[in-house]
Amino acid sequence: MGDDPYYFKGNLNRVTVDMDNEDYRLVLFFIKKGTRMPLHDHPNMSVFFRLIFGSLDYRSYDKVDEKFKYNNFVDDEYHEILSSKKRILAKKSRAMSLKTDDVLFVRPSVNNMHEFVAKENSCFFDVCLPNYTPTNHSRRITYFKEIMKDQITQ
């Protein structure tokens, strides 16, 4: 399956089973060698991760400010934060190489921002508890760009 062109026709493919409910989301990801899954979060969610096959580099961060850690703001404020591309402070919590059968547990405030880079064609399975809620910012995925302290201009 690791070289099956059906599963790796794009850089990042996924199969999602969410049954239109807010309780959970099951996702199978296929990530092609050399592809980076961008830095993202799972706000107010826990995620159980298992690498089915392949090899991934993994980096995770913890948000520092309690307000951002739990998306503790109203919808208008959330949209303003996104449109202004407000910087948030996060500290690196983990960096590791993952191999077949490795598991991770992402909690709402620990390792919640993370990214993967595929060292070879890989497949992993996520169980997200609860499911994302696109209409409510408290459980809506957000993508980030890492900026090092020495790159920040006032």
Give the ranges of each region predicted by the language model.
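Short histidine-centered beta-strand/loop micro-motifs
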Residues: 17-18, 29, 38-42, 50, ...
